[in-house]
Structures are given as structure tokens and as C-alpha cells.
Amino acid sequence: MLNAIKKNGLVLAIFACASTGLVAVTHYLTKDQIKQQEQAQLLSVLNQVIPHDLHDNELFSSCTLVQAEELGTEQAMPAYIAKINGEPSAIAIEAIAPDGYNGAIKVIVGMKIDGTILGTRVLSHQETPGLGDKIDLRVSDWILSFAGKQVTDSNLDRWKVRKDGGDFDQFTGATITPRAVVKSVKQAVQYVNQNNQALLAQPLNCGGE
């Protein structure tokens, strides 16, 4: 009986090693493909928040890392510098809304050098389907309401959902989610407005080349 137990244990050990090896090989073979897919998805979003006619450079590789409290996280976040003929024309910056209903929401905001928002997209979230997930463009066009707006000293009070006295619609049964996104977008734009020149002077250091 002991021999049978040892034999079964050996078989299980071999099977476990083989399974681990298969997972490792699969990861090795697919990691480059996954990375390429992620880069393609990000580039697609970048071209949505900064239109093609506002840049002639490769946005994905024109990236610098930024660490700022206004971006909602202690981690360094990427900012993408758009240029035309070598001159800065727009900036897209990622930020975190830490106070979503179901956790952190990652957004990206594209804006002209003068601070006018070109577009905003949600990159990741865990909000409730049918309620808070309306921040996702695949679910509703709410996120498009930021385009064309600016953040100025005179309109800071308008950067709230309507329930709080601002200009942005909330969702039926879900106010926390849009409130968090509006706040995050406002703070990201404020940060870029206040640190415009410093951002443009930073080295490209995201490692996306």
C-alpha cells in the first residue's frame, strides 16, 4: 500500500510540474502578443482623445511619467505629448478616481495646450452593470460630455454632478460613480493647466518605444 501511495504521489508531482511548465511556456509564448494587443488598445484610445489632425508624432512612444497627488494615486501616471512639426499641440494624461462605487476608476483625458478638453475615456473600472458602468462609452455616451469644456477659476463650482449643483448628469440610482469621474477629470485638467511647461520639458521615460 505504501508503494501505491508513493506511486500516486509521484504521478501527482509529475502532473503538477508538467502543468506548471505548460503555464510558464504558454505565458512566454503569448506575453508579446498580449503586450501588442494592450498597446494597440491604448493607441486606439489615445487617437480618440487626441484627434489625428492634432499630431504627427507617435503618441504611444511620446510619453512621460508623472507623479502628482492631483492624479488620484501615489503611482506615477503616463502623460502623452502630441506634437505637430515638433511643436506641442495637446496632452493626454491618465488619472485615477479612487472613490468609485466599487473601487478605483482609471481615466484618460486629452486636452489642447490651452486646457480645452478634447476627449475623455474610462480605461478600467469595476462599476455595477446597468448603473455605474454608464461611464463606459460602450454602454452610454455620458463620457463624451467633457469634450469642449475647460476648468477655470470661474467655473470650478460647475464641475460637479447636477445633484451637487454642477453641470454634469448623474445616473439614476448611481451618483457616486459619475461624481468620482467628474472630480478626477477636473483635477487632472487642473494639474496639466498648472504644470503645463514642466510637463512638456520632462524626458520621455515611459519605456514605450
Swiss-Prot record:
Residue list for modification FMN phosphoryl threonine: 175
Domain of life: Bacteria
Keyword Coiled coil tagged: no
Topology class, membrane: Single-pass membrane protein
Enzyme Commission designation: 7.-.-.-
Biological processes, Gene Ontology terms: electron transport chain
Cofactor dependency: FMN
GO terms for cellular component: plasma membrane
Alphabetical UniProt keywords: Cell inner membrane, Cell membrane, Electron transport, Flavoprotein, FMN, Membrane, Phosphoprotein, Translocase, Transmembrane, Transmembrane helix, Transport
Location(s) in or outside the cell: Cell inner membrane
Subunit structure: The complex is composed of six subunits: RnfA, RnfB, RnfC, RnfD, RnfE and RnfG.
Protein task: Part of a membrane-bound complex that couples electron transfer with translocation of ions across the membrane.
Record family assignment: Belongs to the RnfG family.
Protein name per Swiss-Prot or TrEMBL: Ion-translocating oxidoreductase complex subunit G
Species in which this protein is naturally found: Vibrio atlanticus (strain LGP32) (Vibrio splendidus (strain Mel32))
